[in-house]
Amino acid sequence: MIETDRLIVPTAVGPQEEQIERALRPRTLAEYVGQAKAREQLEIFIHAARKRSEALDHVLLFGPPGLGKTTLAHIIAREMGVNLRQTSGPVLERAGDLAALLTNLEPHDVLFIDEIHRLSPVVEEVLYPALEDFQIDIMIGEGPAARSVKLDLPPFTLVGATTRAGMLTNPLRDRFGIVARLEFYSAEELGYIVHRSAGLLQMNLDEAGALEIARRSRGTPRIANRLLRRVRDYAEVKAGGEATGAVADAALVMLDVDRAGLDVMDRKLLGAVVEKFMGGPVGLDNLAAAIGEERDTIEDVLEPYLIQQGYLQRTPRGRVATPLAYRHLGIATPASDAELF
């Protein structure tokens, strides 16, 4: 699978990386870099909730993977001075799984559900009254003797995170009082994050090295920190531990991450659209078959950055390569395509 062998995939690739991420994670909103709009809103809402001694309204965080949704959930709990209970949509298979979590919450605690779009309908039905009225219905007994018992819950905050907000049901989406979309980071913001992480890793990294890593990190802090660790390895072996701009560039070229932040899979996808399908439009199923990947992987992992950077367009008829894609691949843009753009 692409997630396990791709250096610039935005999802976490294992327990070891998750452990490193936790060590590098900012602990407060003051330390959190980027997402200025979401950060400002959360600062105000958290301050107001604490001033009134209330639970924070339920929060929905959505956007591409690796942008800091889990980090923000931890920060929200820390800023509120409460406990955080963490789970994910696929883990909550039965209504009882959710009920066990909810009944163990303390007042104002934060319950973080990652991949909340993957909750089962049965679990969602239990969640609705919990979010709205802080109550749940529990079935006691079995068969004809079974009866429903209503349990009161302490006021709590649900923080839901998703990469696919469009898959949330309307009733669930409507129960979030605070909705924040996380955007890709600028090179300057990522440079600051890389510098901070380098300090925590006790690594010698100059400004040019940080910028070289930042501009190849696809606007994603998780990728930036991963590339930083690989540059550190290269610098320690090849450059006496000094990660300059030239050293970072050499390390990333060795890793097949080009100066636009594209890797072999990105170039393979763009090459397929340009060379096998004459620039498009090409349907998603045909494209998936051409490069040997699942359509969900293309939609969720490969496409977002290519579209955001202007290499690819998604049209009603299929995917179309832009002149920028042709230039990046070193292929002349057909005259008919050049006229379209």
Swiss-Prot record:
NCBIfam families to which the protein is assigned, alphabetical: PRK00080.1 (NF000868), ruvB (TIGR00635)
Name used for this protein in its record: Holliday junction branch migration complex subunit RuvB
Annotated region (Head domain (RuvB-H)), positions in chain: 259-341
Cellular component terms (Gene Ontology): cytoplasm; Holliday junction resolvase complex
Main subcellular location of this protein, as a coarse class: cytoplasm
Function description: The RuvA-RuvB-RuvC complex processes Holliday junction (HJ) DNA during genetic recombination and DNA repair, while the RuvA-RuvB complex plays an important role in the rescue of blocked DNA replication forks via replication fork reversal (RFR). RuvA specifically binds to HJ cruciform DNA, conferring on it an open structure. The RuvB hexamer acts as an ATP-dependent pump, pulling dsDNA into and through the RuvAB complex. RuvB forms 2 homohexamers on either side of HJ DNA bound by 1 or 2 RuvA tetramers; 4 subunits per hexamer contact DNA at a time.
GO molecular function annotation: ATP binding; ATP hydrolysis activity; four-way junction DNA binding; four-way junction helicase activity
Keywords: ATP-binding, Cytoplasm, DNA damage, DNA recombination, DNA repair, DNA-binding, Hydrolase, Nucleotide-binding
Protein family: Belongs to the RuvB family.
Binding site for ATP: L24, R25, G66, K69, T70, T71, E132, D133, F134, R175, Y185, R222
Residue ranges, annotated region (Small ATPAse domain (RuvB-S)): 186-256
UniProt free text on domains: Has 3 domains, the large (RuvB-L) and small ATPase (RuvB-S) domains and the C-terminal head (RuvB-H) domain. The head domain binds DNA, while the ATPase domains jointly bind ATP, ADP or are empty depending on the state of the subunit in the translocation cycle. During a single DNA translocation step the structure of each domain remains the same, but their relative positions change.
EC number, as in UniProt: 3.6.4.-
Quaternary data: Homohexamer. Forms an RuvA(8)-RuvB(12)-Holliday junction (HJ) complex. HJ DNA is sandwiched between 2 RuvA tetramers; dsDNA enters through RuvA and exits via RuvB. An RuvB hexamer assembles on each DNA strand where it exits the tetramer. Each RuvB hexamer is contacted by two RuvA subunits (via domain III) on 2 adjacent RuvB subunits; this complex drives branch migration. In the full resolvosome a probable DNA-RuvA(4)-RuvB(12)-RuvC(2) complex forms which resolves the HJ.
